[in-house]
Design a protein with these regions (language model features):
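Alpha-helix C-cap/termination motif
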Residues: 37-41, 81-82
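Active-site clefts of carbohydrate-active enzymes
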Residues: 41-66
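Loop/helix patches that line or flank the sugar-binding groove of alpha-linked glycan CAZymes
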Residues: 1-17, 21-25, 29-32, 66-235
Length: 235
């Protein structure tokens, strides 16, 4: 089952084109409800943060500055250890984030351009309208994969439809030699494959009212072995 409600927890009053911090408790409630009911009813969920129609999860739910790597690993842990099938969108395994565009003309997606025009018609200034569009534009995650630190990030020798902006410090080549995010994803995948209680087990949610911790445990029916997962979204 693919559900997208968790990617709307930063919509102000349900409005996509708004600039609003994400609602952690709402996100937590959604994950808790899906996990518990899927487990009880024998359902199976798709686990993901990113896709081609969303801005990068790291910008929405994590930290893109000092703690970019740890934040990327935290977000990965939160979903890869849950019950369901985890999906990795190209670039999240190296910590890619929204490009640093400075103009609506940097985007090509008609939805973003139309939203910018609609916001201006409401009397919102150009700068504020762009700031809003920048946080939700689909093109954010459609920038070519950062393979290396070359002008077009190793994607091509000619100018791509969207220009990369962080390839000098975030790229596959550098990540494989100096980074820690890709290696962490490998460890998560290996753990999931080797531990049946993660791939096939049940789930029990903890600290449901905690304002910054998302926690749960995984276990098999006999509960002879358990794995506790704690992820801190704010510290």
């Amino acid at each position: 089952v693919f559900t997208f409600h968790h990617l709307k927890v930063d919509y102000k009053n349900g409005e996509k084109w708004s600039k609003e911090p994400f609602d952690f408790m709402k996100l937590k409630h959604l994950f808790t409800e899906w996990q518990e009911k899927m487990d009880q009813g024998g359902g199976w969920n798709a686990l993901f943060w990113n896709n081609h129609d969303q801005p990068w999860a790291l910008n929405r739910f994590g930290d893109t500055g000092k703690y970019r790597e740890k934040s990327s690993e935290m977000l990965a842990t939160a979903i890869h250890c849950m019950r369901g099938t985890p999906y990795i969108y190209m670039g999240e395994e190296i910590g890619m984030m929204d490009p640093h565009y400075s103009s609506i003309h940097d985007y090509v997606d008609v939805e973003a351009k139309n939203a910018f025009a609609a916001l201006k018609q409401k009397g919102i200034s150009d700068d504020e309208a762009f700031a809003i569009v920048k946080t939700k534009a689909r093109d954010n995650s459609r920038v070519p994969m950062h393979w290396d630190d070359s002008k077009f990030a190793g994607f091509s020798e000619s100018k791509p439809w969207l220009l990369p902006t962080d390839q000098d410090r975030i790229n596959v080549e550098k990540e494989l030699h100096e980074g820690e995010i890709f290696a962490y994803y490998q460890k998560l995948i290996k753990l999931r494959k080797h531990e049946q209680l993660i791939s096939d087990g049940h789930i029990r949610m903890f600290l449901k009212d905690d304002p910054q911790i998302f926690a749960y445990e995984r276990f098999l029916k006999d509960e002879a072995k358990k794995i506790l997962v704690f992820t801190n979204f704010y510290g």
